[in-house]
Amino acid sequence: MLIILKENIRTLGKLGEVVKVKPGYARNFLFPQRKAVKATKENLTKLEEQRLLLEEENIKRLNVAKELALSLHDKFVVLIKQASEDGKIFGSVTTREIAKILLQEGHVIDHRSLSFGGISIKNLGEYQVNVELHSEVVVPITIYVVKSETDANELRQVKLQNQKSEQQEAEQDANKEAADGDDS
């Protein structure tokens, strides 16, 4: 089925391009999300008329995504899951769980924009999850899956201390560079 993209989609193409996709993908995902329309002569002429407006809208979404990406930079999420003695969790971690935790922390992210990179999280440990905020903005966040609340609290304290020390080092480096610049 030929469709016209109404926004940039990393795996398909750019705004305004006519691409061929499977009918089910178009009907069940692209059309309901208003990411594409069927490629007809009418829609092609409408799109040409609306192209400028759509491009402005896309730029606004990109700017919002970049702002959200800054707030998610160096973000980590700690999940507490029941697990066996060998570290295998009962069930698996889902994108909905991660999105729910991020929402509790004030970040509104659709679970469909989270990607585990082709793996399923079924063991305790540290994992990278990509958050696709826009077709051009993908932010990695770290997921820690732990067994108990005690482990989670210890991990949070260690991570926060590391972030504070990194921030202090960056400030010291900036102050040192500023002082070196004043001497010349």
Curated annotation (Swiss-Prot):
Keyword rRNA-binding: yes
Chain residue ranges for the region called Disordered: 160-184
InterPro entries (alphabetical): Ribosomal_bL9 (IPR000244), Ribosomal_bL9/RNase_H1_N (IPR009027), Ribosomal_bL9_bac/chp (IPR020594), Ribosomal_bL9_C (IPR020069), Ribosomal_bL9_C_sf (IPR036791), Ribosomal_bL9_N (IPR020070), Ribosomal_bL9_N_sf (IPR036935)
GO MF assignments: rRNA binding; structural constituent of ribosome
Pfam families: Ribosomal_L9_C, Ribosomal_L9_N
Top-level taxon of origin: Bacteria
HAMAP family: Ribosomal_bL9 (MF_00503)
NCBIfam families reported in the protein's UniProt record: L9
Stated family: Belongs to the bacterial ribosomal protein bL9 family.
Annotated function: Binds to the 23S rRNA.
Protein name: Large ribosomal subunit protein bL9
